[in-house]
C-alpha cells in the first residue's frame, strides 16, 4: 500500500533447529522471529496472517489464521510487535512469504506484505 499512513514494515530472523529436525525422515525444523513495525501515522491491529511456505521441491503449503501466536496485537505508530514461531519443511532449503491483514484505527483494512525469506540448513547453500 502506498499511503504512508498505513506503513507496516516486517523484518525476519531465521534459525535452523537441528535438535528438532530429522534429516533421514525429511524433517527440517526452523524458528523465526518477526518484528512488525508500524511506521505509519495510524494505530493498527494485526487481525490475521497468510503464509505461503515453499520447500526446495517447489511444493507449497498455504497457512491462514487469526492473529499471530494466539494474539491480535494493536501496534501504535512508531512502535513494533515481535514474536517467534516456527515451521517444518521436508527439504534442507525453502522459503516463506505472505501478508498480515491489518485494521487501522480509522476503520481502513489493509495488507502488510511479508517479503520472501529463506529457510536453510547451514551449509545447504553454497
From Swiss-Prot:
Residues 2-126 form the ApaG domain. PROSITE patterns: APAG. It comes from the Bacteria. Gene3D superfamilies: ApaG domain. Pfam families: DUF525. GO terms for biological process: error-free translesion synthesis. HAMAP family: ApaG. This is Protein ApaG. The gene is apaG.
Amino acid at each position: 500500500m502506498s499511503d504512508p499512513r498505513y506503513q507496516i514494515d516486517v523484518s525476519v530472523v531465521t534459525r535452523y533447529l537441528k535438535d528438532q529436525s530429522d534429516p533421514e525422515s525429511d524433517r527440517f525444523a526452523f524458528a523465526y522471529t518477526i518484528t512488525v513495525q508500524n511506521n505509519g501515522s495510524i494505530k493498527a491491529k494485526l487481525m490475521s496472517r497468510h503464509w505461503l511456505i515453499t520447500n526446495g521441491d517447489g511444493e507449497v503449503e498455504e497457512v491462514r489464521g487469526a492473529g499471530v501466536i494466539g494474539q491480535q496485537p494493536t501496534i501504535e505508530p512508531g512502535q513494533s510487535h515481535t514474536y517467534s514461531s516456527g515451521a517444518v519443511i521436508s527439504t534442507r532449503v525453502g522459503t516463506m512469504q505472505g501478508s498480515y491483514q491489518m485494521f487501522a484505527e480509522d476503520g481502513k483494512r489493509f495488507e502488510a506484505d511479508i517479503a520472501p525469506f529463506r529457510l536453510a540448513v547451514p551449509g545447504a547453500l553454497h
